[in-house]
Amino acid sequence: MGIRFMLLILCVLSAVLSIQAFAVEADDIVIDGNFKDWEKIPVSVEDPEDQANNPNGDYKALKVATSDDTFCFLQVAYGEITPLDGKRYYYHVLIDVDNKVNTGISNKEYEGKPTKVKRPIGSEFYIQIGRDKGQVEFGSNYALHLETEEILSKDFEWKNNGDSLELAIPFKDFGKYAGSFKVGQTISIAAFQEGEANGWAIDWTESAEHEIGQAYVVQVQDKLPLLWAELKTP
């Protein structure tokens, strides 16, 4: 009986060690235009193809990952994100840091018109990447506090390649609002793209919740799922 028990323990440990090599967390994300480090992170929002003749400004999917000090975000379009086509594109990441729809700025309406989103959020911040003719426009890339319209940061990492764009911004770059981001706290995220390729029609995504600093469950070759955080020793 003792031998069987020990063999069982060894099998479990073997499975755990196999999974550990594949575990992914936000600390492993490098902003380099190679998106393989996002593959194990689940999709937060899937968005339908609904922008006629504007695949480059039409969101397909969003992913979010956070560590204890950094917010990372991946945006995927149906076409080429930020293309060299001579048109202007503005991609926005919305952050509802207190996860309360009745605080911050709602995405239920925009410039007096309903957005038709089914799960609106009340955003305190957005992060914008603005592109014109494939070049970064002066002053168009920034993190903004929506209620005061205060620009908090223009110096954060981002990279585009093909259909995807990734960015990372440390919580400290939110200045006096940095304390709003706490490990274990649930936030909501969404996105919208506004550009001239489709007569300035806006593509709004639905929202998703995200726990700051959360560990992702990883499944590898039908082995036991495990949280990366559980593998770490204090």
What does each model-identified segment do?
Residues 218-234:
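Short acidic, low-complexity intrinsically disordered linear motifs used
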Residues 8-18:
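Bacterial N-terminal signal peptides
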Residues 25-26, 30-53, 83-162:
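Extracellular/luminal beta-rich ligand-recognition
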Residues 66-72, 86-88:
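Extended extracellular/luminal ectodomain segments enriched in beta-structured repeat modules
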Residues 1-9:
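Bacterial N-terminal signal peptides that target proteins for export
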Residues 33, 69-79, 165-171:
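Short, well-ordered beta-strand segments enriched in hydrophobic/aromatic residues
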Residues 159-209:
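Ser/Thr/Pro-rich, low-complexity mucin-like regions
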Residues 80-87, 175-181:
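A short beta-turn/strand-edge loop motif at beta-sheet boundaries
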